Amino acid sequence: MVEAIVEFDYQAQHDDELTISVGEIITNIRKEDGGWWEGQINGRRGLFPDNFVREIKKEMKKDPLTNKAPEKPLHEVPSGNSLLSSETILRTNKRGERRRRRCQVAFSYLPQNDDELELKVGDIIEVVGEVEEGWWEGVLNGKTGMFPSNFIKELSGESDELGISQDEQLSKSSLRETTGSESDGGDSSSTKSEGANGTVATAAIQPKKVKGVGFGDIFKDKPIKLRPRSIEVENDFLPVEKTIGKKLPATTATPDSSKTEMDSRTKSKDYCKVIFPYEAQNDDELTIKEGDIVTLINKDCIDVGWWEGELNGRRGVFPDNFVKLLPPDFEKEGNRPKKPPPPSAPVIKQGAGTTERKHEIKKIPPERPEMLPNRTEEKERPEREPKLDLQKPSVPAIPPKKPRPPKTNSLSRPGALPPRRPERPVGPLTHTRGDSPKIDLAGSSLSGILDKDLSDRSNDIDLEGFDSVVSSTEKLSHPTTSRPKATGRRPPSQSLTSSSLSSPDIFDSPSPEEDKEEHISLAHRGVDASKKTSKTVTISQVSDNKASLPPKPGTMAAGGGGPAPLSSAAPSPLSSSLGTAGHRANSPSLFGTEGKPKMEPAASSQAAVEELRTQVRELRSIIETMKDQQKREIKQLLSELDEEKKIRLRLQMEVNDIKKALQSK
């Protein structure tokens, strides 16, 4: 029959569960997988979480029965003594081997899962084994669980030898007590053995007495019993004896001071919140910052006005008027294990990490204290160095991986994070008026590089060339039209410079109204139209090895239906030589290395002039089309701007109405 003692209160959540309280004994337990056991308490049978209780060995429950049979023959006691002496030595050696590997807690740690141990600075843990890298399994205060290995430091062999010597003293005192029980019931002899062995023997004998065995018959049935549990584990059965009603001896009622402090901290923890920052002035003081949560250890320090506490794994004193106490139920849930999941639903364990602090709503803090409490030992303490070399190392990082607990169906936590989501790309710019035709003026006529493909610069309109155009009221005539031509020379080339094509209006000057519109749409409102008085065109010298060719047919499509503008070059900066030529749609390029057959100088010059005039007229039509298009776009932009202004005004009015409504409330 398996029995267990309740260590934590649990309120039943379903009809088939048991409501258990601390100290109660659950009997007829049937162990099941999944974290839930079935047992009986107060005549009622139901389920309860297994991590809220601690199992009691059968040998411990048989002890009270031994008190009822003191009339056994005396010849059994010597035989029991001989067996006891041999078994005690063997088991003491085994215990020494098992307790050979121990570790001491260097940093405090609060459990994040049910199968983890709560560590406090100074606790001694018996290491069971290394389950996973960074996580060990051990026994602390009778509870077996996992703990991070970088929060502890292993003890040297001296502590192991001390534990073995304590076990030897325990066995010797047990033999003396058994001898006393044979003669007079064991009261006087047990007291003598305690006095002879001192406090160590007293503390070692304490667990067996607490379990209600009695003085005279404490080791009567010892050959049948096992003694595998440590002293710390046996001390945890004190609440059981309170329910049974055994009266403890006066010598066993005074536990060790370190364990008293540990138990008091486990049962009730006090926390305080820092309301004013304080920089440590001595080695034994804590540096606290506003908002920190400090665990109180001792309020009754030697110096009045100073408390002892723990923060980030470091213990020290701090002024009590720099903090305020938190209510007793603060972080109450962190001290008790979580409810295990139902047996059918596995639990995915979360990553082990430091506990998140609970941030309270900030309020107006009281005035900072004017002075610190007086410390009597302040003169004796050395002044603290400016560098924090004497501080304890910070709490190490918790290992990222946690082993699977042996008794639950929980899964191991994922080891890697999902890949990071890529950045959202910037959307391409859209044109609001894509249906309107785009006329490319500078693609073929304003760049000065006529042998380049027109598709590479179809969307670029060079308007800077129009700033250098000076309007003229008279038509310009070429000065070489009446000049005799030399025989054997080719006609003027159609190659133009960027400055020569700056103005589309070469021969016909526009009216003042048209001039003004051209200034607004193409010159970016740079200069007034009245300042344009003349137009100057610079034409480059014709090359000797090239002849005039008709324009490329792609110019018409790129320009929105109009032909590409072309003009000739001449040595004079204030004149131009013009000619006419037919448009050939099958011409593959604007210029080629092959020229036309040689013509008469007069005929070729006249043809070039006519061709240039035709192209100038086409340029003017293109400019007019661009003017109309830009006028339409400007009007559309203005209308959209007006609509946006109206929408903004409506939104502003709605915001004002909402503000007034809120103020009225």
Swiss-Prot record:
Ranges annotated as biased composition (Polar residues): 469-484, 535-546
Any one Pfam family match given in the protein's UniProt record, by short name: SH3_9
PROSITE patterns: SH3 (PS50002)
Modified residues (Phosphothreonine): 254
Membrane found in the keyword field: yes
UniProt biased composition (Basic and acidic residues): 355-390, 517-531
One GO cellular component term: cytoskeleton
Subunit structure: Can self-associate and form homotetramers. Interacts with CD2, F-actin capping protein, PIK3R3, GRB2, EGFR, MET, BLNK, MAP3K4, PDCD6IP, SPRY2, ARHGAP17, ARHGAP27, MAGI2, CRK, BCAR1, SOS1, ASAP1, ARAP3, HIP1R, SYNJ2, INPP5D and STAP1. Interacts with E3 ubiquitin-protein ligases CBL and CBLB, but does not interact with CBLC. Two molecules of SH3KBP1 seem to bind through their respective SH3 1 domain to one molecule of CBLB. The interaction with CBL or CBLB and EGFR is increased upon EGF stimulation. The interaction with CBL is attenuated by PDCD6IP. Interacts (via SH3 domains) with ARAP1. (Microbial infection) Interacts (via SH3 domains) with Chikungunya virus non-structural protein 3 (via C-terminus); this interaction plays a role in initiation of viral replication.
Protein name: SH3 domain-containing kinase-binding protein 1
Organism, as annotated: Homo sapiens
